[in-house]
Amino acid sequence: MKMDKIAVLIPCYNEEKTVEKVVRDARKVLPDAVIYVYNNNSSDRTAELAAKAGAVVRNEYMQGKGNVIRRMFREVDAQCYIMVDGDDTYPMEAAPEMVEKVLQHNADMVVGDRLSSTYFTENKRPFHNFGNSLVRGSINRLFHCNVRDIMTGYRAFSYEFVKTFPVLSTGFEIETEMTIHAVNNNMQIDNVIIEYRDRPEGSASKLNTYSDGVKVLRTIVRLYRDYKPMGFFTVLAALLAILAIIFIIPVITAYWETGQVRKFPTLIVCGFTMIAALQAFFSGMILSNMSLTNRREFEIQLNQLHRHKLEGMMEEEQ
């Protein structure tokens, strides 16, 4: 198995104005790295200019950033991965520090943190600022963590993270999925504060504030259900139980006063709603036990991957 020491992964869609500079900057700060540009059906000269700058250019024909990342993670083997967008909004000067945290300090994911520096002043799209803050707050509360930038497109990964990450999303919600995967599996997450700069003039963002924002929030709910089923279904059970109690109180009150059940259909609906609440609660318990089993299997898989990586490194040295 051929394994790169450092692989720089650049997903691109119509980035002809910036991709050449991003590749050159990556080569300058990481001269020993192999730089891969994955072209996602660009209609401009992105692939041509990336190859001219010295990158290995490959194509992903299924549209969407999640699909590109799935292809990259499947095809590239490396001890350390740097993933950066091709829009020149992230400084490559931070890459060596991020690599060091993976290779020397055993980090599984290093987050290029924009939100602790210049993002809110440089970014000219106010709803993006609100969305980033909302997503960060939601995930940190739901998953009891303290990740400073959930949506950043600038990250470093270990081999173990890349080869265990199941890519389920197809679009920009992929960053949220990565963060939750690392948090839920107790992977080591480090942070590097970076200076964010807005896109250069003539370079348009591919992120749709509203539709992609809804997808991200939907992904958070889905992953909370999948990774924290006890919490999710307990909340659902509580809501159903409260609803049943609210509507059954007038029925019970009327029965005490008159000795008759005047709203029999309401009583039946409340009974079924309470049964649904109990089912939701016990479903959460069952799924929580299944999740625990999956965690045990994941740890075994992680150990096997670590041995596989060490064998690959030894082969490279020989």
Which residues does each predicted region cover?
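Donor nucleotide-sugar binding loop of glycosyltransferases
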Residues: 15-18, 42, 65, 91
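Acceptor/aglycone-binding surface of glycosyltransferases and processive sugar-polymer synthases
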Residues: 61-75, 80, 92-172, 176, ...
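Short, well-formed alpha-helical segments that are part of the catalytic scaffolds
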Residues: 14-28
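A conserved acidic beta->alpha catalytic loop
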Residues: 39-47
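Hydrophobic helical membrane-anchoring modules
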Residues: 2, 169, 174-318
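Cell-envelope/extracellular polymer assembly enzymes that use nucleotide-activated donors
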Residues: 5-7, 34, 177
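Active-site acidic short loop of glycosyltransferases
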Residues: 3, 32, 76-79
